Amino acid sequence: MEYKFDREWILEPIGGDTGQAYVGYNDANDERVFLKRNSSPLLTILSMEGFAPKLKWTKRESSGDIMTAQDWVYGNVLSHFEVAQLPVVKLMYRYHHSDNLYNMLVKIDGDVYEPERFLQDYQSNLSKELRNHHFLTCVENCLWDTRHLVDGARKTVCHGDLNRRNFIRAEDNQLYLVDWEMVKIADPILDISQLLVQYVDFKNWDAWFDLYGLRITYDIYQRIEWYSMLNLLNMIKKDYQENRMMAMNHKILKLKHIYNNRYLQQVGEM
């Protein structure tokens, strides 16, 4: 369904969790752009540093909403296999270590997350069925009991929604990461483990760490376990909300593997 944005632009909604994204057509100039309502305030610097497609303009609507326009990128979303490869690792490393991005997020009072806040978010709007699920409750209790072991880690900019569909490779081979609405200041292991539990086999995690340049210590290993279990809990919660039971059960099996073999179990009993 198309509708007029102003005299120049016709908008057509495209898929997305927010329902605020559009393809914008300007027939007079034969131009196409990606339009989004109330996108991340980081968009300007994300565009400048090459993490996101070029920002073309912004416009305030009569409602007070801000509409942003970016270059329309002709390309493809990454496959399950491609997300685990070196270009994505390099991109993640760059934004995790970008002082400009971090300083801007601090300047605009970006959300700062400690382990306790992540657990509070998980509990928010959690269904009765999942609250009463014995195994998931055991995992959650483990995370509460061991949160002090992962607290106080160095924080960076974290994307927070590393789904393969948010990685776009343009026709010129430029790799972009889009949908920064869940960006936060947190332990970068949040992002790393989020990607690992979705797209990298357990047997290949060490090789992935080498690509990223992550030297595994006991401290880092505990954080990887903790955030891997947290991310899987959140994914299970979302699968349940969206009635994806097969996907949910697959993640529960993955979570059981991590939980039953966890180092945190030994630490928590000391």
Residue ranges and their predicted role:
Residues 197-199, 211-270:
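Helix-rich C-terminal or lid/interface subdomains of diverse kinases
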Residues 52, 92, 119-122, 205, ...:
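A general structural signal for well-ordered alpha-helical segments in protein cores
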Residues 11-105:
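ATP-binding pocket architecture of kinase catalytic cores
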